[in-house]
Design a protein with these regions (language model features):
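Glycine-rich active-site loop/strand segments that organize a redox cofactor
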Residues: 1
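Predominantly flavin-linked oxidoreductase catalytic cores and closely associated redox partners
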Residues: 6-138, 148-155
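A short alpha/beta connector and helix-capping loop motif
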Residues: 53-56, 60, 156, 173-187
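FAD-binding beta-loop-beta segment adjacent to the flavin cofactor pocket
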Residues: 89, 93, 143-162, 171, ...
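Short FAD-binding loop at a beta-strand-to-alpha-helix junction that anchors the flavin cofactor
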Residues: 98, 103-105, 155-173
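Histidine- and/or cysteine-centered catalytic micro-motif in compact active-site loops
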Residues: 111-113, 141-144, 165-167, 172-175
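Flavin-binding catalytic cores
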Residues: 116-142, 153, 157-160, 182-203
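C-terminal helical "tail/cap" subdomain of flavin- and related membrane-associated enzymes
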Residues: 181, 185-277
């Protein structure tokens, strides 16, 4: 809301245009699209275009297909969530996520971590999984491929990057909602201007980024160990530190607790590969 109010009272929404280039001309930002040109003093850029020079870790992709379904019979337990039910596949990590809303209604999602995920193959697997719940009604479906990578966004003078391009996605999970929420709370009601744009930039916890780099190295080199890595984390970690770790607000003690829960030999292999990269 504070960003919107910073754009004066009138906001014009322009649809069906694709940004091809952003340039600076005498402190005026020039946005060139496939059909027109736009000008402004400040650009808020929410695109996910990551430059090669900004990448600071292995680049892995998370692909998912999720369906919210409603059954004719009661088969779900609203008090239980299935976070990761792993499917054994070569050279990738694949699992099912089930979030029940009622005894008959739930979100069922098939997710893959891979360098080059095949979304069509994931859709086919997802269809087979849904067959086990027949008869059902599909209320909605979501699918996407998102990057899992640690980035260090360039701080361009009059361009504020937000979202994936602004480093707001957690590399080890592909999840951005928590970081975006934390960032929104931090900026509060302040108004964006040319003088304070640097204070609006998201800054990731360097220790979280360091651990995420090691994690990405492990699942890149040893994808078959992914299920073991996750199981050790959720079995051994104390719940409050784990929640703060996953919520992007860990203390130093939380980070130590998480490290002690991880398979040491496997993490050392990830660390060794990181140093060699």
């Amino acid at each position: 809301e504070s960003l919107s109010s910073s754009c004066n009272e009138k906001i014009t929404t322009i649809k069906n245009e694709k940004v091809s280039q952003i340039d600076s001309d005498n402190n005026i930002q020039v946005v060139t699209t496939n059909s027109s040109t736009h000008f402004g003093k400040i650009i808020v850029d929410s695109r996910s275009n990551i430059k090669q020079q900004e990448i600071k870790s292995p680049l892995i992709h998370q692909a998912f297909v999720g369906s919210e379904i409603e059954l004719t019979k009661e088969r779900f337990n609203p008090d239980e969530v299935t976070l990761m039910s792993f499917i054994k596949k070569e050279n990738q990590i694949e699992f099912i996520y089930i979030l029940p809303f009622t005894k008959k209604r739930a979100l069922v999602e098939t997710t893959v971590f891979s360098i080059e995920p095949d979304l069509k193959a994931i859709e086919n697997t997802h269809k087979e999984i849904l067959k086990t719940y027949e008869p059902y009604k599909e209320i909605r479906q979501e699918k996407a491929i998102i990057p899992m990578v640690v980035i260090s966004p360039f701080g361009e003078k009059r361009i504020l990057k937000i979202g994936i391009g602004g480093g707001m996605m957690r590399a080890s999970s592909g999840y951005s909602m928590r970081r975006v929420a934390n960032w929104a709370i931090k900026i509060g009601e302040r108004r964006l201007s040319e003088d304070n744009i640097s204070t609006f930039r998201h800054r990731s916890n360097k220790w979280l980024n360091y651990l995420d780099k090691i994690f990405l190295n492990v699942i890149l080199k040893y994808p078959e160990k992914g299920p073991y890595l996750f199981m050790m984390l959720f079995r051994r970690a104390k719940m409050p530190p784990l929640i703060r770790f996953l919520s992007d607000k860990p203390s130093g003690a939380d980070l130590i607790n998480i490290l002690l829960c991880m398979p040491k030999r496997l993490m050392l292999k990830g660390l060794a590969k990181k140093k060699n990269d």
